[in-house]
């Protein structure tokens, strides 16, 4: 999680986990991130290697290639392979660009 937070800070866009509190959402662009699933690798009846699914949602009020480039540059710089999709949320008058990828979880407890 610390690595993910460092990546988000490096992007230079305001972010929150899942959503901003009511009335505290910044003006676009902003990011929301989620850890909706895991694909842990088992061995000997326990979690041997933790893998987290990560979703970073970029919200903008118009198509914003500069904001997308900020996110993608950081992911690319750190060698993160991601899938990207985009949708217009008409009810919110926002664009959402979704970046999905897997990231190593906290594996500090592994025996060497």
Q: Language-model features: where?
A:
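Long, contiguous binding/interaction regions
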Residues: 1-53, 59-112
